[in-house]
A protein has these predicted regions:
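Positively charged n-region of N-terminal signal peptides that target proteins for export
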Residues: 1-5
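Bacterial signal peptide processing site
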Residues: 22-25
C-alpha cells in the first residue's frame, strides 16, 4: 500500500516540476514539503514492517515509530496549502487527527503488558482512516477525484475517531 503512495508521490512531484517554467514559489515549497512527508512516512513504515513480532522490544519499537508517524502527519496538517490544492487542507487535518488517535489507542492497547484486542481494533481503524485520507490527498494532487470519496461542499471536517466503548 505504501509503495503505491510513493509511486503516486513520484508522479505528483514530476507533474508539479514539469508544470511550467513560471512555478510559484509557494507551489515549489509545497511540492518539497509533500515529497519530504512521503519520504519520512515511507521510511517509518519500512521500520514498522521490519519489526520482528517475537522481539522483546517489538511493542516499544512500534509505539516509537507510530509516534514519529503521527508527528509527520501533524507536520502535513500544518502545511501552508496553495490555493490550487485547498481541498487537501481538511484531508490533512483529518488524517493527522486519525493518526493521533491511532497512536493514543495503540499506547493504551499495550499498556501494562496487557493486550486489549478491542483497543487494537479501534487503533487499526483510525490508522486505516488516516492512510485513506493520505491516499485521497495523493489522488487529488494528481488532479483527480478519489473513487468512492464523498464530495463535501463548503467547510468542514469529518473526523470521527473510532474508540472503544
Amino acid at each position: 500500500m505504501l509503495k503505491r503512495y510513493v509511486l503516486i508521490l513520484v508522479t505528483i512531484t514530476s507533474m508539479l516540476f514539469f508544470s511550467g517554467c513560471g512555478e510559484k514559489e509557494e507551489l515549489t515549497v509545497f511540492k518539497e514539503q509533500i515529497s519530504n512527508f512521503y519520504t519520512e512516512v515511507s521510511a517509518i513504515e519500512t521500520e514498522i514492517n521490519a519489526i520482528a513480532e517475537d522481539s522483546e522490544n517489538a511493542v516499544s519499537t512500534l509505539l516509537i515509530n507510530m509516534e514519529q508517524m503521527s508527528e509527520q502527519f501533524q507536520k502535513l496538517a500544518d502545511l501552508e496549502v496553495p490555493a490550487e490544492f485547498v481541498s487537501v487542507e481538511d484531508l490533512a487535518d483529518d488524517a493527522a487527527s486519525y493518526m493521533y488517535e491511532a497512536v493514543r489507542l495503540y499506547g493504551e492497547a499495550y499498556e501494562d503488558d496487557y493486550v486489549s484486542d478491542s483497543l487494537i481494533q479501534a487503533a487499526s481503524y483510525n490508522y486505516e482512516s488516516a492512510m485513506k485520507r493520505i491516499n485521497y490527498i495523493a489522488i487529488l494532487l494528481q488532479g483527480e477525484i478519489p473513487e468512492g470519496a464523498p464530495v463535501i461542499e463548503g467547510d468542514g471536517t469529518e473526523f470521527e475517531p473510532y474508540v472503544e466503548e
